[in-house]
A protein has these predicted regions:
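Acidic (Asp/Glu-rich), glycine- and aromatic
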Residues: 86-135
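Extended, loop-rich substrate-binding clefts of extracytoplasmic carbohydrate-active enzymes
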Residues: 34-92, 208-228
Length: 291
């Protein structure tokens, strides 16, 4: 666990924690803990079962007294691969991780997940069918945001499906993706204990060209908010060859909102219901902005 004077100059808040296996999580100023990240995902949502790599050793560079960042090194190991990670952690209004990963597959890996994110989505205001809960919404993240290599901006609302659901968004050299918590009004959740309105968003910014591949979104059915049921990651189109060094770098933004500003007005709500005039379905999409 790493502590720093983030909210007050006289108190060292917990900034991030490495949680076991390859899981870790972080917060920025005034956040409460929410979604997590992992070092590497292998065979996620595959019929044969998932492989869970683990960080087996850590090294910490001692920061100077005036330092605004700290460097963590980690060794990851699993049956299929080993990897070395370097994290530069900078806490603040948004907490930034600069990540360098050097991966050595022991076998060819086709079902790999780079920069995997793990979150929870139970329900929201627009999908409360069958929900018996006083709260309007319960989720750590409400949507997958994508900024493609072609500049397209995509927002995919999350769901709690009846069966396992996997979606893939093909891309070349993505500019970024993340699991975002956009609703920041306490009234959107009305939960004084969980404070979902203060959960961080997590945006992944590739550093360098990632080539062809796809952002995968895995949605797992759940009936309780204690279970993480959302996974998102980047999967290269070509399998990772065994015995070859693979290097990737990316920046993680644990933030209140996406670190890039869209020039498009965002969709804030989508409502669906029966038409009052015939048997058709009526879709009402609310957009806020002037573009």
């Amino acid at each position: 666990r790493i502590h720093a004077p983030m909210n007050r100059p006289d108190y060292f808040d917990e900034v991030c924690a490495f949680l076991g296996a390859s899981y870790f999580r972080a917060i920025a100023k005034n956040h409460t803990y929410g979604l997590s990240a992992r070092g590497l995902a292998i065979k996620t949502a595959e019929p044969g079962g998932e492989e869970f790599p683990a960080f087996v050793a850590y090294w910490l560079e001692r920061p100077t007294q005036e330092a605004g960042s700290v460097v963590v090194h980690a060794l990851l190991d699993s049956r299929s691969a080993a990897a070395a990670f370097r994290f530069v952690v900078r806490p603040g209004e948004a907490t930034i991780f600069d990540v360098e990963m050097t991966l050595y597959p022991r076998v060819e890996i086709a079902q790999v997940g780079i920069a995997p994110l793990t979150s929870m989505y139970l329900f929201a205001a627009n999908d409360r069918a069958g929900v018996d809960d006083f709260r309007p919404a319960v989720h750590d993240s409400e949507g997958l945001s994508l900024w493609t290599g072609r500049g397209e901006q995509i927002w995919r609302p999350l769901s709690n499906p009846a069966e396992l659901q996997v979606s893939a968004f093909a891309d070349t050299d993505p500019r970024g993706f993340g699991l975002m918590q956009r609703q920041r009004d306490f009234g959107g959740y009305k939960d004084l204990e969980a404070r979902y309105d203060r959960r961080p968003s997590l945006w992944i910014e590739p550093l360098g060209k990632w080539g062809k591949g796809a952002v995968h979104l895995v949605e797992i059915p759940t009936d309780r908010e204690i279970h993480d049921n959302i996974v998102a990651f980047w999967r290269p189109e070509a399998p990772l060859a065994a015995g070859v060094e693979h290097t990737l770098s990316y920046r993680m933004h644990w933030c209140w909102e996406a670190p890039w500003k869209s020039d498009l007005a965002p969709v804030t709500d989508t409502r669906v219901g029966r038409s009052l005039t015939d048997r058709s379905r009526l879709f009402v999409v609310e957009v806020v902005g002037d573009k």
